[in-house]
C-alpha cells in the first residue's frame, strides 16, 4: 500500500501507524513465545530471594492502575495487612500477577466485579482471582493454559494467547500451583505457594 504513489500524506501516515502496531504485536508475540518456551523447558535461571508477596501484588496493582481505571470494572482487593515472605523469583512472580490482572481487564464482562484475594495459612499462601467473563467459557480449564489458546474465540482483543501459559509455567517453576476453573461465565484462577 505504501508503494502507491497516489497516497495522500494522511493515508501514508495511517498505514505506517498500522504497520507499527503490527510490528509491535509481532515483537511481543515472539518475546512471549520465547519466554514460555524457556519456561516449559526449564531453561530459565530463577533468582530466588525472600519476597513479600503481599507487597509485590500491591506493586503490580499500583503499576497497572491506569489500565484498570481505563476499564469499567470494579476490582475488589482483599489482601492481608501483614507481610508474607516467601522464597520466590520476584520478577517472574510479578509477571504472573501482571498477566492475570491484564487478562481480567481484557476478558471480564463490562460493568462487572473482579475479586482478588490472598489467603495465608500455616502451610501455604493462596491467591485467588475471580471475574465474570464477557463470554460463556466452554473450554476445558486445563486447555486454556496451553499456548495460543484464548477464551475469547472472536479474538477481538489484543494478546498473544500466551499470558496464561506463561503465568502457569512461571508459577510451577517456583514450586507453586496454578489452577483454573470455570463455571459457565465465572472464571477463577488459584495460585498456591507452599511455605
Predicted regions: what is each one?
Residues 175-176:
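Conserved glycine-rich
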Residues 7, 11, 41-46, 85-88:
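Conserved micro-motifs of the catalytic ATP-binding
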Residues 104-105:
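Short helix-loop "hinge" at the ATP-lid/N-box region of the Bergerat-fold HATPase_c
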Residues 47-50, 69, 74-84:
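Conserved catalytic submotifs in the C-terminal HATPase_c
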